[in-house]
From Swiss-Prot:
Topology with respect to the bilayer: Multi-pass membrane protein
Transmembrane segments: 13-32, 61-81, 96-116, 130-150
Domain of life: Eukaryota
Keywords, alphabetical: Membrane, Transmembrane, Transmembrane helix
Keyword Transmembrane listed: yes
PANTHER family in alphabetical order: CLAUDIN DOMAIN-CONTAINING PROTEIN 2, EPITHELIAL MEMBRANE PROTEIN-RELATED
Protein name: Claudin domain-containing protein 2
Pfam families: PMP22_Claudin
Length: 167
């Protein structure tokens, strides 16, 4: 397996891991813990009873960005697998790179907005759903860089293929 294929495989594996972490983070209700309960983007649970969170701008922005980040990550995974299974043109690889970096940016916005809302409350502690989001962030960016390097290798190979090599 060449360097390009290895980078694409690594990018797909990291993207798969980040997609799983992002979906788990988005759908579970353990973003914060407080005395007697926990809450997420969609519901808050107190003493075993869960109810929907009333509409708050910061939580709505975080939820929307998380859903978009998860969607873009999954779409990038599908394109990345298609690129690896078939020798696809460079345009698909560039779309994957853009989707991965955009997904990472949306994830960063969601987590930063949620952090700014809850970081100042001394009785609130961040929990595992929240940390899954932060854990997915570097994996998305590293996956994007893997596809970027693989695309650069492909473009440089195409660029020098017409030159005669004298060694």
């Amino acid at each position: 397996m060449g360097v390009k294929k290895s980078l694409q495989t690594g990018g797909n594996l990291l993207n798969l891991l980040s997609s799983i972490l992002t979906v788990l983070s988005t759908t579970t209700n353990y973003w914060t813990r407080q005395q007697g309960g926990h809450s997420g983007l969609w519901q808050e649970c107190t003493h075993g009873k869960c109810s929907n969170i009333p509409c708050q701008n910061t939580v709505a922005v975080s939820a929307a960005c998380m859903v978009l980040a998860a969607t873009f990550s999954i779409v990038a995974l599908g394109i990345g697998i298609r690129i690896q299974c078939r020798e696809a043109e460079s345009r698909r690889s560039q779309n994957t790179i853009v989707l991965l970096f955009l997904s990472g940016l949306l994830l960063l916005i969601a987590l930063a907005v949620y952090t700014s809302k809850n970081a100042w409350k001394p009785e609130v502690f961040f929990s595992w759903s929240y940390f899954f989001g932060w854990l997915a962030l570097p994996f998305l960016f590293i996956a994007g860089f893997c596809f970027l390097l693989a695309d650069m290798i492909l473009q440089s190979t195409e660029a020098i293929s017409g030159f005669p090599v004298c060694l």
